[in-house]
Amino acid sequence: MWSLFRLLDDGCRVEVLDVGASLASTAPYQKLVETGRARVTGFEPNEAEYERLRSSYGLTHRFYPLFVGDGKEATFHETNNPFTGSLYAPNTPLLEKFHALASLVTPVAEHRVATTCLDDIADLGDIDFIKIDVQGAELDVLRNGQRILQGVLAIQTEVNFLEQYHGQAMFSDLDAFLRANGFQFHCVLGYGWRPFLPLLNPRAGVKAFNQQVWADAVYVRDWMQLDRLSAEKLE
């Protein structure tokens, strides 16, 4: 089986930036962390998840309990699920068109919060890989992190094909921004599906009569512009 480890020198360490770093699922870089090949700088404003991250990863890695965005005050829309809260309001009428979607994104409360721009954080260092999952605010994170993006080699971001949150950026918006900033679409790592109500096939689960709602998309540095990268990055 092909392995990234074969491409990395023994002393190579990948600098990872994770925005929305909760432990809801296994991180795509987890094996690199387990073998000492990656250092993570993560942002997770949920207090319980933030403490879990610090406990799980230890002092080698850095985590901050911050909302990352455009640097302005914003409203955080708390929901009944700690992993579906967002800086954008849930689009409940749309969510109610599908099985098992609105029930996971039920509004609970609103909180005024401060957001931080990635480019305003001085000690992030030279980042190689970015992973983003912030429920509709992905483009806000990237737009306000263009200094950081200059050295990034790959990005894994959640993208949406339906407006689950009012005013959120769609897949086409993220794609246009990333291509304009020197990245090319590489692949999709799985889709989120939901069947329309009231249609349901118990034998097929959520993939019956389905709609593709979201996905994790991977972008890589434009291979036609590799001359713009430093020798260290190319190695």
PLM-predicted stretches and their roles:
Residues 1-235:
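Phosphate/nucleotide-binding beta-alpha loop and adjacent structural elements of enzyme active sites
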